[in-house]
Amino acid sequence: MPSPPYTLERTVVIQATPATVFGFLTDTPLWAAWWGAGSEIDARPGGQMKICYPGGTEAVGEVIEVTPPERLVFTYGYASGKMIPPGGSRVTIELEPLGAATRLRLTHELDNEPVREDHIQGWRYQLSLFANVVADAVNSGASGVVDAWYDAWADTDAASRQRTLSRLAAPALRFRDRYSNTDGIDDLVAHIAGAQRFMPGIRMQRRGEVRHCQGTVLADFVARSSDGQDRASGTTTREPRIAARVAAYSAHQYARATGWR
């Protein structure tokens, strides 16, 4: 099809590798996890795609180009023929590595400006939703990582604590709260030893489910003394970094003290 004259462009950074992100664009179950039940895509040139929106609206199109894991192009229109007829616009999705993450750039080419304006908010919403759907998969084991992180704070064996943190965290880990400012795992290991010395018997535990938004993980915690009393509470935030071995975390912890004793 000739290039339509009006262009809508959006970008979003997703905390996953291009290969992982591309899978959500080309695998029907993952495509449906983004768009909704009944949505499907045959990710090969000439293949058909369908998007099932709430309320019964359907978008349909034909796949034009598939270049794993970098580029997907398809036509886009509504089965009803209203606003955009089938084949009446073109969507290009390009993926670019950004460190351990991926920058997704979407270009939607349309025939008229009012329709372009009508789709800006829709793509803003859909790409944010997409980033979180991918993060759901990438962070599926986040609860175990968070629990191991808190366990390391109670480990009195420095060598064991070092091994655990090296497995969980990026080497350049930066830790910040009201009482500390550390850089690197060695610095944090020493800081934990100091915390154990001056606050003996205190143990942090996760409270509730781990939450995340577009790759940033949030976990509420309570710091509890050996007599079962809650001494502090707060929220730990971690930005995932994908590694070949495990999901590595650069940690920034912001504690809200409620009265150490």
What kind of region is each of these model predictions?
Residues 15-19, 141-168:
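Short acidic-aromatic low-complexity motifs
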Residues 18, 37-52, 59-61, 160-215:
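A solvent-exposed, acidic/Ser-Thr-rich amphipathic alpha-helical stretch
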Residues 132-144:
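Short, highly charged C-terminal tails/helix-capping segments
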Residues 21-22, 31, 49, 63, ...:
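Hydrophobic pocket/interface hotspot
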Residues 67-72:
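Short, conserved beta-turn/loop elements at beta-strand boundaries and strand-helix junctions
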Residues 81-133, 190-261:
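A beta-strand edge to alpha-helix "cap/lid" segment located at domain peripheries
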Residues 1-40, 142:
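Hydrophobic ligand-binding cavity/cleft-lining segments
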